[in-house]
Amino acid sequence: MSDLNNPRDIIIAPVVSEKSYGLMEQGTYTFLVRPDSNKTQIKIAVEKIFGVKVSSVNTLNREGKTKRTRFGYGRRKSTKRAMVTLAAGSDPIDIFGGSAS
Protein backbone atom coordinates (compact mmCIF):
# COMPACT_ATOMS: atom_id res chain seq x y z
CA MET A 1 0.00 0.00 0.00
CA SER A 2 1.33 3.42 -0.86
CA ASP A 3 1.86 6.12 1.71
CA LEU A 4 0.62 9.68 1.25
CA ASN A 5 3.61 10.92 3.27
CA ASN A 6 5.89 10.00 0.36
CA PRO A 7 5.67 12.83 -2.22
CA ARG A 8 6.24 10.46 -5.15
CA ASP A 9 3.05 8.59 -4.23
CA ILE A 10 0.97 11.77 -4.61
CA ILE A 11 2.27 12.98 -8.00
CA ILE A 12 1.58 10.24 -10.57
CA ALA A 13 2.66 11.78 -13.89
CA PRO A 14 2.81 15.05 -15.83
CA VAL A 15 -0.04 15.73 -18.24
CA VAL A 16 1.14 15.83 -21.85
CA SER A 17 -1.28 17.94 -23.88
CA GLU A 18 -1.31 21.03 -26.04
CA LYS A 19 -2.95 23.07 -23.31
CA SER A 20 -0.47 21.98 -20.63
CA TYR A 21 2.48 22.86 -22.89
CA GLY A 22 1.02 26.36 -23.38
CA LEU A 23 0.60 26.80 -19.63
CA MET A 24 4.21 25.75 -18.97
CA GLU A 25 5.42 28.98 -20.57
CA GLN A 26 3.39 30.89 -17.97
CA GLY A 27 4.84 28.88 -15.07
CA THR A 28 1.83 26.57 -14.57
CA TYR A 29 2.41 22.80 -14.66
CA THR A 30 -0.27 20.10 -14.84
CA PHE A 31 0.06 16.74 -13.09
CA LEU A 32 -2.06 13.64 -12.61
CA VAL A 33 -2.38 13.14 -8.86
CA ARG A 34 -3.96 10.61 -6.53
CA PRO A 35 -7.71 11.17 -6.19
CA ASP A 36 -7.55 11.23 -2.37
CA SER A 37 -4.82 13.88 -2.15
CA ASN A 38 -5.57 17.50 -1.25
CA LYS A 39 -4.05 20.82 -2.36
CA THR A 40 -1.71 21.11 0.62
CA GLN A 41 -0.28 17.62 0.06
CA ILE A 42 0.17 18.36 -3.66
CA LYS A 43 1.98 21.64 -2.93
CA ILE A 44 4.37 19.99 -0.46
CA ALA A 45 5.02 17.08 -2.86
CA VAL A 46 5.90 19.36 -5.81
CA GLU A 47 8.17 21.50 -3.64
CA LYS A 48 10.02 18.42 -2.32
CA ILE A 49 10.35 16.59 -5.65
CA PHE A 50 11.35 19.50 -7.89
CA GLY A 51 12.87 21.94 -5.36
CA VAL A 52 10.71 24.91 -6.39
CA LYS A 53 8.40 27.36 -4.60
CA VAL A 54 4.67 26.90 -5.38
CA SER A 55 2.33 29.88 -5.24
CA SER A 56 -1.01 28.15 -5.96
CA VAL A 57 -2.60 24.78 -6.69
CA ASN A 58 -5.87 24.28 -8.57
CA THR A 59 -7.40 20.81 -8.76
CA LEU A 60 -10.04 19.29 -10.98
CA ASN A 61 -11.72 15.90 -10.92
CA ARG A 62 -12.31 14.32 -14.32
CA GLU A 63 -15.03 11.70 -14.48
CA GLY A 64 -14.17 8.56 -16.44
CA LYS A 65 -15.85 8.13 -19.81
CA THR A 66 -18.36 5.38 -20.50
CA LYS A 67 -17.20 3.29 -23.44
CA ARG A 68 -18.84 0.55 -25.49
CA THR A 69 -17.13 -2.81 -25.51
CA ARG A 70 -18.12 -6.00 -27.20
CA PHE A 71 -19.54 -7.22 -23.89
CA GLY A 72 -21.66 -4.15 -23.14
CA TYR A 73 -20.56 -0.93 -21.50
CA GLY A 74 -17.34 -0.31 -19.65
CA ARG A 75 -15.98 2.69 -17.83
CA ARG A 76 -12.57 4.35 -17.80
CA LYS A 77 -11.31 5.31 -14.38
CA SER A 78 -11.86 8.81 -13.04
CA THR A 79 -8.74 10.95 -12.57
CA LYS A 80 -7.69 14.01 -10.63
CA ARG A 81 -5.46 16.71 -12.09
CA ALA A 82 -3.54 19.44 -10.33
CA MET A 83 -2.51 22.68 -12.02
CA VAL A 84 0.46 23.99 -10.05
CA THR A 85 1.58 27.61 -10.48
CA LEU A 86 5.14 28.43 -9.44
CA ALA A 87 6.05 31.54 -7.49
CA ALA A 88 7.56 34.48 -9.35
CA GLY A 89 11.32 34.14 -9.72
CA SER A 90 11.25 30.37 -9.27
CA ASP A 91 13.27 28.19 -11.65
CA PRO A 92 11.23 26.29 -14.28
CA ILE A 93 10.65 22.57 -13.80
CA ASP A 94 12.34 20.19 -16.25
CA ILE A 95 9.54 17.61 -16.27
CA PHE A 96 10.67 15.51 -19.21
CA GLY A 97 14.34 15.21 -18.25
CA GLY A 98 17.37 16.19 -20.29
CA SER A 99 18.15 15.53 -23.93
CA ALA A 100 17.55 12.09 -25.39
CA SER A 101 21.06 11.76 -26.85
Swiss-Prot record:
Alphabetized InterPro entries for the sequence: Nucleotide-bd_a/b_plait_sf (IPR012677), Ribosomal_uL23-like (IPR013025), Ribosomal_uL23/eL15/eS24_sf (IPR012678)
Recorded GO CC terms: ribonucleoprotein complex; ribosome
Annotated keywords: Ribonucleoprotein, Ribosomal protein, RNA-binding, rRNA-binding
Keyword Kinase in record: no
GO BP annotations, alphabetical order: translation
Superkingdom of origin organism: Bacteria
Self-association state and partner proteins as the record states: Part of the 50S ribosomal subunit. Contacts protein L29, and trigger factor when it is bound to the ribosome.
UniProt similarity note: Belongs to the universal ribosomal protein uL23 family.
Record-given protein name: Large ribosomal subunit protein uL23
Organism: Corynebacterium kroppenstedtii (strain DSM 44385 / JCM 11950 / CIP 105744 / CCUG 35717)
